[in-house]
A protein has these predicted regions:
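Long, low-complexity, charged/polar intrinsically disordered regions in eukaryotic proteins
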Residues: 1-36
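Long, charge-rich, low-complexity alpha-helical segments
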Residues: 2-3, 34-98
Length: 98
């Protein structure tokens, strides 16, 4: 599955990013020379933060999907589609900034 390859590449880039909580959102901020670059950041809602944490903990697509179904009231197909879209967004943001 291509998504698991994307997840592995996002995991490899994780040390180059920092998460900063701002209100109910989390900012995913790239590090440049070990300094947070607040000119470029991705805002994550609660579910996005949950997924990013699961990715950085080494989980694969199937494990993340199962965790979403266990913690949120959502249709499995909808969760899969939304997870696919979010992984692609994270991949473009993290690998593109890496």
């Amino acid at each position: 599955m291509q998504q698991n390859q994307y997840i592995q590449e996002i995991q490899a880039q994780a040390p180059h990013f920092v998460c900063k909580e701002v209100g109910s959102d989390t900012l995913l901020v790239p590090l440049r020379n070990n300094v947070a670059d607040f000119n470029q950041y991705l805002t994550l809602n609660e579910l996005g933060s949950f997924i990013y944490l699961l990715i950085t903990e080494g989980n694969n697509f199937e494990q993340i999907h199962a965790a979403i179904l266990a913690n949120y009231e959502v249709n499995p197909d909808e969760a899969s589609q939304d997870l696919n879209a979010f992984i692609e967004l994270l991949y473009k943001y993290t690998v593109g900034n890496g």
